[in-house]
Amino acid sequence: MVFVSDSSISLPIWDAPRARGPIVSDLAIPGSKSITNRALILAALASTPSTIIDVLRSRDTDLMTDGLRSLGITITEEAVDRYRVEPGQLSAGSVECGLAGTVMRFLPPVAAFADGPVHFDGDPQARVRPMTSILDALRSLGVEVDNNNLPFTVNAGEVPEGGVVEIDASGSSQFVSGLLLSAPRFKNGVTVKHVGGRLPSMPHIEMTVDMLRSAGIEIEESENQWVVHPGEILGRTWRIEPDLSNATPFLAAAAVTGGTIKINHWPIKTTQPGDAIRSILERMGCEVELVAQGEGYDLSVTGPVALKGIEIDMSDIGELTPTVAALAALASTESRLTGIAHLRGHETDRLAALTAEINKLGGKCTELKDGLLIEPASLHGGVWHSYADHRMATAGAIIGLAVDDVQVEDIKTTSKTFPGFENVWEEMVG
C-alpha cells in the first residue's frame, strides 16, 4: 500500500540543492538508530543500570525512550547524546509507535513483563504495517493480545513461561529481533524458529545476537533457529556506532558528482547493513578507501566520471534500496535490484513509491516481482514525494544533486532517523 499526499494538506516543499561541480566534504554522522534502540531495550531489561554513549536523537529513538519511560523505566539524559538507564518493574502504560518499526515490534515482547495492560498505537501508516507474525508469536507464548495490527493491547498477567515459537519473519527480520531481545526474561527462555520464505535483513538479526551476547546472554544459532537461554541481562556501557545507512546518501553525493566524501569514524567490524555500501559503490565505479585516522578509520569515497549500473541481490540490505535506486536512476547503464519484495511492507511500499517518483522525473524504472529494473534515462525536475518515508526523502535529495529543479516534499520526515539532515546536506553542497 502506497500512501500519497492528501491534497487537502499542504506539506512543505524543499528545493533540493543542485551540485555545480564535484562535492568535497568531511562529515561526522550521528549514531545508529538500530543499535541505539536495541541498546535501550537491553538496558531496560537488564539487572543493573546501563550507560549509553553517542545516542542517536531522532524521532524513532525518542519514541523508544518515551515508550520505555511510559512502562516505568528511568532514563536520565546526562548529556544530549548520553543516557543513564535504570531498570525496574515494568508497569502498565501506553506506547506511541509513530512509524518506528523497532518500537512497534520490539516493545510488545517487553510489555509481556509489565504488571498491567500496555496499549500500543501509531501513525496512520503504521496501522497497515505487518504485525501479525510477532503478535501471534506472543500469543503462542501465553501473552494476551487483542488485535492483529495497531492499535492493540498487550496483557500478560504474570511472567510468561517461554518455550518454542514458530514465526514467519519473511516480511521483516524485526519480528525475530523483537522476540530475541526479550527472550532471556522468559522463565524458560525462548526458541525462535523461522518457518516462512527467505528471511530478509540478516545483518540486523546478527546485530541483535551480537548485542545480546555482549550483555551476557547465551544463544545457540542454527539455520533459521535461535535458542535463547534464560538469564540476567547485564547492565553495561554501550557506545553507539555512526549510522552507516544514514551515511549512504552523503557517500552517494561523491558518486553522483565525481567528488570526494569522507565519513569519520567508520567501524572496521560491524553488523550494520550500511557497511555494504562500500562494495556497492566500488562496483558502480567509485574509488573506496578506509583511511587510518587516530585510533580508528575514516571512509573515503571518490566518484567516477560516469556512474555504472549494478545488478545486486539486496535481500540482506534492503534499507539501502532508496539510495541505490537513486544512484541507478543517474547511472549510465542498466541496474537490477532484487530480493527486496519485503520493502512493500516498510514505511511505505518502497518499490511502488520509487518506481512512481523516478518515472515522474522522466526515469525508466520498472517494478519487478521482488525488486526494480532501472534503465538509463534523461531526468528532469519536478516534485519528489516522500510518502512520510525518511529514505524516500533522501533519495530525492540525491537525484536533486544531478538534476535541476527537483523539489522534495516534506524533507523533515528525515527526522525519523537524522534530525537536521537538510541542513547538513545544504552545507555539504555549498
UniProtKB/Swiss-Prot annotation:
Species this protein is from: Corynebacterium glutamicum (strain R)
Residue positions binding 3-phosphoshikimate: K33, S34, R38, S172, S173, Q174, S201, E319, H346
Disulfide links within the chain: none
GO biological process, one term: chorismate biosynthetic process
A Pfam entry, by short name: EPSP_synthase
Family in the record: Belongs to the EPSP synthase family.
UniProtKB keywords: Amino-acid biosynthesis, Aromatic amino acid biosynthesis, Cytoplasm, Transferase
Function: Catalyzes the transfer of the enolpyruvyl moiety of phosphoenolpyruvate (PEP) to the 5-hydroxyl of shikimate-3-phosphate (S3P) to produce enolpyruvyl shikimate-3-phosphate and inorganic phosphate.
Coiled-coil zones: none
Keyword Transferase attributed: yes
Keyword rRNA processing among UniProt keywords: no
Residues annotated to bind phosphoenolpyruvate: K33, G101, R129, Q174, R350, R391, K416
EC number annotated for this UniProt entry: 2.5.1.19
GO molecular function: 3-phosphoshikimate 1-carboxyvinyltransferase activity
This protein's name: 3-phosphoshikimate 1-carboxyvinyltransferase
PROSITE patterns membership: EPSP_SYNTHASE_1, EPSP_SYNTHASE_2
Quaternary data: Monomer.
Cited InterPro entries: Enolpyruvate_Tfrase_dom, Enolpyruvate_Tfrase_sf, EPSP_synthase, EPSP_synthase_CS, RNA3'P_cycl/enolpyr_Trfase_a/b
